[in-house]
UniProtKB/Swiss-Prot annotation:
GO biological process: translation
A single Gene Ontology CC term: cytosolic large ribosomal subunit
Protein biosynthesis keyword on record: no
Gene (name only): rplV
Segments crossing the lipid bilayer: none
SUPFAM superfamilies, A to Z: Ribosomal protein L22
Function according to Swiss-Prot or TrEMBL: This protein binds specifically to 23S rRNA; its binding is stimulated by other ribosomal proteins, e.g. L4, L17, and L20. It is important during the early stages of 50S assembly. It makes multiple contacts with different domains of the 23S rRNA in the assembled 50S subunit and ribosome. The globular domain of the protein is located near the polypeptide exit tunnel on the outside of the subunit, while an extended beta-hairpin is found that lines the wall of the exit tunnel in the center of the 70S ribosome.
Family of the protein in this entry: Belongs to the universal ribosomal protein uL22 family.
Taxonomic source organism: Picosynechococcus sp. (strain ATCC 27264 / PCC 7002 / PR-6)
Identification of the protein by name: Large ribosomal subunit protein uL22
Complex and partners: Part of the 50S ribosomal subunit.
Record's keyword terms, sorted: Ribonucleoprotein, Ribosomal protein, RNA-binding, rRNA-binding
Pfam families: Ribosomal_L22
């Protein structure tokens, strides 16, 4: 696989209300694939994380097309990762005056595309 990382274009979605572990499961499937192949994979995977990842991928390709003048057919997903964001902490009332903490994780999704050929 040959990827030109000099003209790498990326898009970032921040504060997505989803666990980064669950998002990484989806990102591992599209890393290194062509744009067209990644679109097909994301359309048909049964995970909720596919929707924000698909949005970020389309945004990265739009950035490449508009800002760099690259052809979407030649683009390959060169990098895709999810970092942990801040955790929203909530409390659930329990019996006898107690409260359990509920953690609602967020993540930052980054997808980078570059011209190249996927094999």
């Amino acid at each position: 696989m040959t990827i030109d990382t000099q003209t790498e274009v990326k898009a970032i979605a921040r504060y997505i209300r989803m666990s980064p572990i669950k998002v990484r499961r989806v990102l591992d499937q599209i890393r290194g694939r062509s744009y067209r192949e990644a679109l097909i994979i994301l359309e048909f995977m049964p995970y909720r994380a596919c929707e924000p990842v698909l949005k970020v991928l389309r945004s990265a390709v739009a950035n490449a097309e508009h800002n760099e003048g690259l052809d979407p057919a030649d683009l390959v997903v060169s990098a895709a990762f999810a970092d942990a964001g801040p955790v929203l902490k909530r409390f659930r009332p329990r019996a006898q005056g107690r409260a359990y903490q509920i953690r609602k994780p967020t993540c930052h999704i980054t997808v980078a595309v570059a011209p190249g050929s996927a094999e």
